[in-house]
Each structure stands twice: as C-alpha cells, then as structure tokens.
Amino acid sequence: MAAAAAGPGAWAAQEKQFPPALLSFFIYNPRFGPREGEEENKILFYHPNEVEKNEKIRNVGLCEAIVQFTRTFSPSKPAKSLHTQKNRQFFNEPEENFWMVMVVRNPIIEKQSKDGKAVVEYQEEELLDKVYSSVLQQCYSMYKLFNGTFLKAMEDGGVKLLKERLEKFFHRYLQTLHLQSCDLLDIFGGISFFPLDKMTYLKIQSFINRMEESLSVVKYTAFLYNDQLIWSGLEQDDMRILYKYLTTSLFPRHIEPELAGRDSPVRAEMPGNLQHYGRFLTGPLNLNDPEAKCRFPKIFVNTDDTYEELHLIVYKAMSAAVCFMIDASTPLTLDFCRRLDSIVGPQLTVLASDICEQFNINKRISGSEKEPQFKFIYFNHMNLAEKSTIHMRKTPSVSLTSVHPDLMKILGDINSDFTRADEDEEIIVKAMSDYWVVGKKSDQRELYVILSQKNANLIEVNEEVKKLCATQFNNIFFLD
C-alpha cells in the first residue's frame, strides 16, 4: 500500500510528492566491444546523451555484470529488474545480445523536518515491475513497427545505421513516455473494440471489400470508429502496437484541427449531392496542391517470417478512420491519392454517419449514457479485447483514471498474483480507504472491479460482481 498522506497541520502543507521519472535509457550489445578499451563500442544508444562517456561505460558494464550474475541462476531468463532504494532498473533482451535498459526513479515524498530541513523519502514499493517491464517491451515494439528489427538495420548498413535509427526514433519517443500514468492497461496492451449490431458490421465488411477491390494495391485494411477497432486484416500482435500508435499518438494530434472545422464538409460540391468529410491523416495535406508530397510513414509487420514493409495510409471521415496498408515497393503518386480520396471519402462519410446513428439508438435502448455504476477493467488474452470504465479519455500526454492511485496499485498487485498461478482464481481485497477490490481470472479472461460500498460484507460484494457479470458480460462465462 502507498504511504498515507500526512496528517493535518504544518506537515501536510509542507509535504511534496514527486512521481516516478525516467533517469536513463540505453541499448547495448556486449559483443560489439569485447576487448579492453573498446567498451564504448557496445553502446548503441544512451539517454540522456549529455552523460559523460566514462559514466555511460560504467553503467553499461554494471548492467552486463548483473545479467551475467543472474544468468547463473536462470540461464534462459536472466535479469528482469533490479531494485534499489532510489530507483529501479528494467532489463529487456528483445533480440539476441541486444539489451535495452530503462532506469526509473522511485516516487519521492519530500517533507520538512522540525528544524526546517527537507527530508526525502523514496517510495520503494510503489512501482510495479510488470507495468514498467511492459512499458520497456512497448518501446521495442514501437521501434520495430517503424524501423524493423535491430538485426535488419545491421544487415542494411551495419552498426552506424542502427545507431542512426535508434537515435532518430528514441530521441522523440522517450519524450512521449509518461511514466507517472502507466498502469495495468500497459501490461495488457489490449485493444478496445467498438460495440456493433450485425447489420452495421456487415455494412463495414462490405465497404472494406469494395475498397480492396477498387484499390487493388491494398494489402491489409483496418477500420476504427471513435478510436475503437472494428475490423483488422493484420496479425494480432502487429495490430495491437499499430492500435497503440494510432490512439495515443496519431489521432490525438489531429483532434484540435478537427474541432476547429467540424461543421463544414471538406468538399460539399461532390457529384450526386454526396457529402465528403474525408481527409488524409498521413500523406498529402492538400490534394489540390500539385507540389503536395505523397510521403507516407512505413511500417514493418510479420517480422518473424515474411517481413513485410508497408506504406501506412490513414484516412478519416468524421469519427471513422480506415488504415490502408500497401506494399512499400509500390510507388504512391498524387493521382493515386486523389483517386483514393474520391472513392473512399463520400462512402466513408455515409458509413460514419450510419454507425453514429446506430450507436446512439443502441445507447438509448441500453441506457448506457449514464455514469457507469461499476468501475471495472476487463481483458481477454485470446482476442486482446480490453474494456475499462476506470480510464477516462486518453490525452496525448496522460491517461486519466477516475480512481485513486492506491487502488490502481492494488489492481496491479492482484494481476501479479494471477500471473504466478496457472489455474483460475478470484481475489477480494478490502482497501485501507474502505473500497472493495475484486479480481477474477477465468478461462484466459481477467476482470477487475472496484466497489465503493464501504459497509458491504464478502457475500454482498460477491453478489454485486455477479450482477456486473450478468449486465456487462452476459455472453461470457466466468467461473463462480
């Protein structure tokens, strides 16, 4: 449990809290500088770069020693994390001999002592290993999505090219890590699916088939509405990381311009009176500009076998977004972009308003417009489906939760217990703040519920959770 806030009086007024922070992040390969005097060659990327050379070498050497030492006890899975009073180090070996290390400062509480001096207390137990190990794995997955594997860079241009790619990517990416708001959802890395009735789903399926037929170069398609996934032709693991990029980086960057010009179609004078709200989120900004650049980001998928490099076209109309992925060897011209815009724009606009209408009807019928009665997180390991009423809208910089961090920590602790047990189980915890926290693990699914009935007993809590399962998950089997 987290340390309780200071009591009333001067102590409380003078207590300052500092969240966890990234101290350093580096990538090294011990094979690249095996002899004395060559140690610097091992370091492929180091943040912050201002750190003196000898200190970088010393820190990497220490990590090597820790990995070697732990390998004695666990040859296949050496070091995962190292706990110290002030910080915690996380280790990941995503490819053979390539090590990524992330050092996170523990949260701090600073108090004033009676003689006016600042007393610093490090909250050593606050960070959850599983959460930050998952964040470190995400760093690699996101790099791989846009650059391919470390080995691919070595094949393309040796260590020099790998260093350039790492510098270019991580220099920007590390600024987007908001370690203070990482939690259980980072462990799951799941996908939020949009709830749809059968008819609307068939309309979307039919739209995708038509688009793939009209634009024959399209290899894979993904369809999202309201930042939630409806359809994807990609493998699950590739989609989960692309989904994270879209929902935490690309879409939030385009929200502001959208709000500014929401009420006017992009081109109202379409033939046949079809309105057209479509626009590119990646690629050309203005299709009428003959000088417009048709550059799209490239992504790498199926890196374990076929290793495909693709152009990523993200096109949006109102709240619907469609991703078209095209082989990177296919040249994309301004004419192609105009053709895509004229085919996809009007149809996607109509489809987006159909989905919106149907969604609002379903919302009225189910009465789901009201504040959710239960605060819960659900995750299905089989299809990566994730649902949370605890997390409010993610902003580009932070994921907002509607519950106290202490309760989020308990959820993480329950998840760690689930990981250690193979069989299905249920854990019920009464928090210091009188909330009840329930975790259920059943048949590859996990459900976490927070209840605020302070005077309830175990039997009543169990009944409430059953009620939640019946209303929210009526078609899902949870063991009692």
Curated annotation (Swiss-Prot):
One of its GO terms (cellular component) is lysosomal membrane. It comes from Mus musculus (Mouse). Keywords: Acetylation, Guanine-nucleotide releasing factor, Lysosome, Membrane, Phosphoprotein. This is Vacuolar fusion protein CCZ1 homolog. One of its GO terms (molecular function) is guanyl-nucleotide exchange factor activity. InterPro entries: Ccz1, CCZ1/INTU/HSP4_longin_1, CCZ1/INTU/HSP4_longin_3, CCZ1/INTU_longin_2. Belongs to the CCZ1 family. It holds the Pfam family Intu_longin_3. The modification Phosphoserine is found at S74, S264.
